[in-house]
Amino acid sequence: MIASIGDSAEPPLRRTRRAQQQDRPPTQLAAAEMLHNMNGAETAASFIVKDASENKIASLTTLGNQSIAARKLVESLQAGAPTIKLNREDTVNVLKFLNDVYTNQLEVVNIS
């Protein structure tokens, strides 16, 4: 048999699944992790999304045990106001609350 440049005595290495998973782009890995987390344990975000109550009041009331911003949102939503009026401090608290929901920093503790 005639040897060519690319021939070697060893068979070509097969890529394992683990090696294939490492080649995925970081955005795909982040998306897969986010979907896995949403389907797994009860996160604050999934708790709010699954809430069927009007204006998500039930889930915000439960999260209000941990966050004054959630309580402030519940008060405004229960009043039925077309807008939610917030001062500077309340605005910062609501933004921190929404960041905590987004980054999964809140635990869902339903004590009712």
Curated annotation (Swiss-Prot):
Residues 1-27 are annotated as: Disordered. It comes from the Viruses. Keywords: Late protein. This is Uncharacterized 12.2 kDa protein in P6.5-VP48 intergenic region. It comes from Orgyia pseudotsugata multicapsid polyhedrosis virus (OpMNPV). The lineage of its organism: Viruses, Viruses incertae sedis, Naldaviricetes, Lefavirales, Baculoviridae.
